[in-house]
Amino acid sequence: MPKVALYNQNGENIGEIELNDAVFGIEPNKHVLFEAVIMQRASLRQGTHKTKNRAEVSGGGRKPWRQKGTGRARQGSIRSPQWRGGGVVFGPVPRSYSYKLPKKVRRLAIKSALSSKVLENSIVVLDNLTLEAPKTKEMVKILNNLSVDRKALIVTADANENVILSARNIPGVTVVTASGINVLDVLNHDKLVITKAAVEKVEEVLA
């Protein structure tokens, strides 16, 4: 089982914590990570693109000139696709790009992401993370104590409003709960700062 240092909010090493091999100690599967990131990014797409077809473009109800006798090619509407300003054939319509990978693949992806952070030595485990009031200054101090000076993902066991409000104005810092942890967030941040209680919750679900 991988062992990592356990810190308090002052940045002091107060011991070690054993992480579950099945969650934090597997060989990261790069292809599964790739598939999971593509899935998440697809779900974030708005899908609000839209073009008008010949029935929706304004105008064009009248035949532009008579069928025969002008010497020009026959035309039925100035809004047919070959005309400038005409309708678009088979253009994009609003749609959802979201899809889901199988549950086993999604679980393997998050375990691979967490294990990669352990291998990179980019995981910081806190014994507890509590703030008496929402103070950005206090959160910055805690992160400095832990030598976290880059993009960081903070994972708490449950939603903590003081922690969320204290971190929301810090560039590159994101707060999620153990139940909301996802591959894109883990890979998109340099450091993973996770509380001991959150570790236990993640292991309970994924082990």
From Swiss-Prot:
Residues 45-78 are annotated as: Disordered. The keyword rRNA-binding applies. GO terms for molecular function: rRNA binding; structural constituent of ribosome. Keywords: Ribonucleoprotein, Ribosomal protein, RNA-binding, rRNA-binding. One of its GO terms (cellular component) is ribosome. GO terms for biological process: translation. SUPFAM superfamilies: Ribosomal protein L4 (SSF52166). The keyword Ribonucleoprotein applies. It holds the Pfam family Ribosomal_L4. InterPro entries: Ribosomal_uL4 (IPR002136), Ribosomal_uL4-like (IPR013005), Ribosomal_uL4_dom_sf (IPR023574). Part of the 50S ribosomal subunit. One of the primary rRNA binding proteins, this protein initially binds near the 5'-end of the 23S rRNA. It is important during the early stages of 50S assembly. It makes multiple contacts with different domains of the 23S rRNA in the assembled 50S subunit and ribosome. Forms part of the polypeptide exit tunnel. Belongs to the universal ribosomal protein uL4 family. This is Large ribosomal subunit protein uL4. It comes from Anoxybacillus flavithermus (strain DSM 21510 / WK1). The gene is rplD.
